[in-house]
């Protein structure tokens, strides 16, 4: 699937594929999608998690099929047909079984509403945002959270940090932008175990940018921010837009900035580099994130 125009040059835009499950409307960032296939019979896997329908092999590549209705506790009625949305993120190829694909919409992250606590119950929520399209509400699903719930081993490798043991405390302040409550907590816990205790956590790029502007006015930005870690997908302002703003600002551009996202692939890496990101890592690589923070902060403070 052609995604060349997506999130280009930090425009704060994305394309959302709208699909349905039991006549409810949901969305996924097109950047995650490899292709869409018609339903094919799958081979069940013994003792698999209930949401895993089975496996199939398009073009000799084995792919696990996940039933989104099961994941969202929706009724699974009648004969299963529909479509498979084949995705790639966190270095995984997966198929999500849906009823129907409605179309693709280009939208701004600023138009995506952050779900409140009634929709997203903290770390248990599976929605990253809600957007109004053609008079209806479309829920943007947190596919990383859905997959991690099914198979925790696909998430952050917290064991990478635990194996290193406790480290000496480091007071270097880090500014974070991450919209997922679960991932935000996991990343924060891992950084604290690695000695980084001075963390300023924000729910999206706009919150992080506003903090940077506040510190600039105070004249304290270089005392309060020694490194920035940002996700890409976030409501209101995405990580690419935040990166562009930081690296275009004469007072902020020398602050090390790391993009830490499930979307980092070859194409997205090129976009991040063009915007000036100092490093880009995929989300399972939490151990590598800590190593990169060590290197960039050490280099900046010399």
Where are these predicted regions, by residue range?
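Active-site residues of response regulator receiver
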Residues: 231, 261
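Short amphipathic alpha-helix used as the core "switch/output" element in two-component signaling
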Residues: 240-253
């Amino acid at each position: 699937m052609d995604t060349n125009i997506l999130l280009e040059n930090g425009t704060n835009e994305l394309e959302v594929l709208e699909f349905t499950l039991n006549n409810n409307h949901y969305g996924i960032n097109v950047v995650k999608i490899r292709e869409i296939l018609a339903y094919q019979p799958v081979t069940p896997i013994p003792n698999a998690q209930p949401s895993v329908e089975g496996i199939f092999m398009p073009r000799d590549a084995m792919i696990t099929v996940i039933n989104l209705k099961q994941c969202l506790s929706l009724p699974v009625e009648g004969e299963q047909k529909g479509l498979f949305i084949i995705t790639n993120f966190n270095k995984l190829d997966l198929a999500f079984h849906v009823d129907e694909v409605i179309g693709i919409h280009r939208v701004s992250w600023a138009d995506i509403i952050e779900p409140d606590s009634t929709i997203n119950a903290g770390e248990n929520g599976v929605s990253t945002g809600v957007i109004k399209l053609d008079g209806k509400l479309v829920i943007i699903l947190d596919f990383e959270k859905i997959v991690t719930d099914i198979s925790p081993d696909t998430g952050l490798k917290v064991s990478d940090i635990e194996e290193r043991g406790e480290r000496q405390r480091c007071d270097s302040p880090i500014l974070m932008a991450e919209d997922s409550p679960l991932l935000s907590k996991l990343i924060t816990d891992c950084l604290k175990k690695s000695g980084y205790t001075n963390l300023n956590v924000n729910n999206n790029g706009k919150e992080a940018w506003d903090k940077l502007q506040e510190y600039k006015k105070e004249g304290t930005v270089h005392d309060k921010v020694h490194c920035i870690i940002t996700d890409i997908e976030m409501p209101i302002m995405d990580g690419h837009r935040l990166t562009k703003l930081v690296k275009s600002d004469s007072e902020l551009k020398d602050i090390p900035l790391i993009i830490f996202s499930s979307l980092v692939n070859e194409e997205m890496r090129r976009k991040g580099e063009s915007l000036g990101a100092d490093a880009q890592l995929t989300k399972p690589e939490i151990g590598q994130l800590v190593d990169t923070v060590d290197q960039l902060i050490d280099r900046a403070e010399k």
